[in-house]
Amino acid sequence: MATPKAALVLMELQNDFLALEGKAYPLLKTVLEENNVVSNLNALIRGARELGMPIIHTPIEFSEDYREMGADPYGILKIVKTLGAFQRGTWGAQIADSIDRHPSDIMIENKSGIDAFCGTRLDQVLRAKGITTIVLAGQLTHLCIESTMRSAYDKGYRVLSVTDATATIGMEQYRMSVEHNWPMFSLPVTHKAFFGQAARG
């Protein structure tokens, strides 16, 4: 794989998901711990940075009144609103304190839905940099990761999804997504396998 044409796209590595005090952390706790997700994410980030890959964060944020969701949210967005999570400008919406950061990291703003391409400049940033391969990691495995994966697939990107650097609301949902859906729209790899591919070119 030609790493100069690849970017690491990180989904929602925010305190409300990854910090012990985060409002949505209890929902992800089992998968985060069982898969050693934060440690694997940081290894992935550091390795990608050493390869010269752009590191792109796509946090999700909402106004204090969650007006972006409309009058009657349902599904996962209703859960987010009920928890009071990811309010713009709060500690919970910030990139998690446990995540390796660098001033060169790119922040994609205005994501208030499931698909990181929808309503953001992600596609423009990737194409401006000549990116043809995206490496996906973060949260939630069967929601934002999978939705963004499908969009990237339709847009013609080569998509690699990192199986041990993602979490969601239970091992059953995690396994169903990674084992059955991810292979339809991406090339699933562990973070170590990804670097093995990169080393081989």
Question: Where are the predicted features?
Answer:
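Short hydrophobic beta-strand that contains or immediately precedes a catalytic carboxylate
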Residues: 9-11
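Short acidic, Gly/Ser-rich segments with clustered Asp/Glu that frequently serve as metal-coordination loops
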Residues: 14-20
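A short alpha/beta connector and helix-capping loop motif
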Residues: 4-6, 22-48, 52-55
